[in-house]
Amino acid sequence: MTGSLHYLRFSSAFFALLGFLGATIGSAATEPVPPVPADHVQRFGRGLKDASIALETSGNSKPISKSSKPFSGWPFQPLATVTPPSGSLPTSHPVDGFIAARLTEKGLSLNPEADRRTLLRRASFDLLGLPPSPEALEAFEQDTAIGAWDRALDRMLAQPQHGERWARHWLDVARFAESSGFEHDYDRPGAYHYRDFVIKALNADMPFDQFVHWQLAGDEFEPENPLALMATGFLGAGVFPTQITANEVERTRYDAMDDMLSTTGSAMLGLTVGCARCHDHKFDPITTQDYYRMLSTFTTTVRSLRSLDLNPEQTQQQLKAFELEQAGLVAARTLYEKKILPDRFEAWLRAGDGWKVKADWELLESPEWKSKAGASFRSMGDGSVLVEGKNADYDTYTFTAETSTADLRSLRLEALPDPSLPQGGPGRADNGNLGLSRIRVFAEPRSGGIRHEIHLVRPRATFEQNHGSLSIASSLDDDFHTGWAVDPKFGTRQAAIVDFETPVQMPGGIRLTVELEFQVNVRHHIGRPRISVTSQTAAPFDPESVPAEIRRLLSRINSPGNSPESLSSSERATLMSWWKTSDEGWRAAQQRVELHAKNRPKPALTSILMCGEGYPALRMHTQGGDFLPETHFLHRGSADQKRGVATQSFLQVLMKSADSESQWHWQPPAGAEYSGRRRSLALWITDTREGAGHLLARVIVNRLWQHHFGQGLVTTPNDFGVQGTPPSHPELLDWLASELIRGGWRLKPLHRLLMTSQTYRQSSTESELKLRIDPSNRCFSRHVPARLEAEAIRDTLLWITGALDPTQFGPGTLDESSRRRSIYFTVKRSQLIPILQVFDSPEPLVSQGTRPATTVAPQALWLLNNPQVREWASRWASQEGGNPRSEPDLWIHRAYQRALQRLPRDTELKASRLFLAQQMERYRTGGTSQPERMAATDLLHALLSLNEVIYVD
């Protein structure tokens, strides 16, 4: 043998023998197996001998590579300029011209067009994954005007179910799942956003080149677009071990990058790029150098969780309205400060008795402290307690004490510093902060009686972290995420005062219970609290809490020989700025401002799983870094055998000139934290003139053809290389790829183009001639009936029975009783949905270009015996119009139209009528309370189990 491709050439007897052995091994027959013909055995032996000799004489020939021998395979050639043949068909459709030319060579022709019911049902399942409604079918059958078929297609392409249907095809290719796989199979919160992106992109008919750009580098193309960031979930959808020792970090990282590259190659280029990891590709012109230089694209790409506002425009509108209202409240407070506050301040100064600094605060008798989370309290001898022991994430302190005072009007909570607290306190958080989410006060007679809650008003504090969500006012609402905090005033005494809306008056004394709830942030509890009460209203803070400048001014005007008139204008302004916090009118205006500020619209942040650079990596149980700073060439794929640093390039066979990768290299803007390598890869993949764009177009066009015609023009959609199958109609494939590019890479026009052809619309009638000449239908001489995929089967049953929930997008579920479309099931690799597996849904481990379509007993058994199917049938029976007893024919007609999109045949009508009558009688005889309902359920369940429901002609 010469050259670099190794082939085993066996005789026809060899393949006949292999076929015989395969059929024998795969059969379930119990009859004795006939002996293998002797001449076949002899020829089989000679074939093996010849093959071994050929391999031995091949010497040390190297695998094919760009450097040794240029490969001229069809996938790597530019798109051919093709003119559609003008065949003998009455149709002028270009697709039919290509198909008819091949059929003519074989002495065949297209089948006649299928009937309208079959066509609409076929198209509805193809485009929507659901059957057409009886109303839609009737409207189509009655629309005899020119263009009826085109209009029907346009209506379906515009429906939101289209994206759900075709997203499922792409998610197979993208090996999409929402867990990491392996033995722990941890969930990936936010991964479902990638699924939602695919649905939205397909419904919006996003150009396919942009669809590819965003999946590879959405964060580099449009870093502020949430949808573009969601799209990058494509790269991170693969399996990943989440328990990684230090010795495994490097190998695991190369595995993760290989998954990204291999999936990109299979899904977008139809090439098994990953086969060049350990050596030059044995069949395709891909070298290990190509592999590692392309692999370096993903050197610093990591999975990351980002919290994003998915509706920024709505948030901006809400903020605009909020700021307008807030400005009005601030203006009202400013007007009060200018027109009213000065006179009230002067009256306070003239009164004189309001100058005293310290309120008459009383420490309650025998206080008792309790911690819900189990912390302990140590008395400090000054009425305060030091909180010690367990510092749980969240806690609630309960303070109970008594007083003989019969009239209480205010309560003061002090948060004292202490050397034992972090940063000196006053909180127990690592930085010394606190977060009081709610304060509640209850009172009851000291001698016993009914306890009631006191309504707290006019909150004020020595210091607040802000005047909104972290103010003392926010400790009086029911939002546990907001509350009093004091950052950065650590290591100092802080205090808060609240007044009682109505004085608490109990002649025999009062028992008070105070609850302090801490849920603003983890471990943000007060470290040394002290509580006191007073009978004064709007009492000021004691001297220690009053700023030094204010204490100085108050002391001066209180000293003999001085009066308020001795204050300068600036001193009066300083004093009034402090005093106004005790003025009821100003506090009311300020409270309106602050309460409104608490309601400032916040973006509804949603966590999405994305892949990118410069973001915090999603942490795994890894004893090492999240990525490696460089990608190396690895000898035989071993991370222990590095052979130099790999710099980014692409597949040489898909570049017009060697080492010309610089034309696609994109330089990120200054300050960007991403490398631009993934955007460079995306630009090369979609470049139809110099890069891989022509192959990208061929691959996606082939995928569309595959799902409309049952098999692709290339039957190995993930492998266009030597090991794949060549296209049955290469000129048609190139012409369709060119049409896609000329049409701006939009897929919906291509769907329409394919489905308006006579090739698509032909019937599935078979003939002996076609079965003999075109047994596998590679010439597309007929339409081949096909079973629906697992998701479409379940969705169809839900739709027929009226149980389908059309809600789109959002988190999925593992609950099999969910009535949403099957694409919204959570894809957990260790907990796949059984019904989908029964009908051949693949495991999402690697890119899947095709699904098997098996026929096994559990499928029929599931339809007949599954409780959910029975429940759906019962639901349908309760909703179906008409009476199966008094109007059986009408009722049966409606049931057949809903389930099979046709009326029953005479024999079916007669059999169904008889079945209903017999079942009603059986249930009535057996004492069933609803014999008609039960009999109807039985018949409808039988209809759901028909092959006709899950097969499409």
Segments predicted by a language model, with ranges:
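Extended extracellular/luminal ectodomain segments enriched in beta-structured repeat modules
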Residues: S404-S410, M506-T513
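Short beta-strand-plus-loop segments that form exposed binding edges in beta-rich domains
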Residues: A415-P417, E515-V522
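Bacterial N-terminal signal peptides
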Residues: S11-T24
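Disordered, acidic Ser/Thr/Pro-rich linker "stalks" and the adjacent N-terminal cap
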Residues: A347-T396, T403, P419, F442-G508, ...
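Post-cleavage N-terminal segment of exported redox proteins
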Residues: S27-E31, H40-P84, R168, S179, ...
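Primarily short, surface-exposed interaction patches in extracytoplasmic proteins
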Residues: P90-R121, D126, L130-Q161, F176-P223, ...
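Sequence context surrounding c-type heme c attachment/ligation sites in exported
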Residues: E220-A327, P543-A548, L836, Q848
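Electron-transfer interface patches adjacent to heme c in soluble/periplasmic c-type cytochromes
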Residues: E31-P32, A80-S92, G236, F240-M257, ...
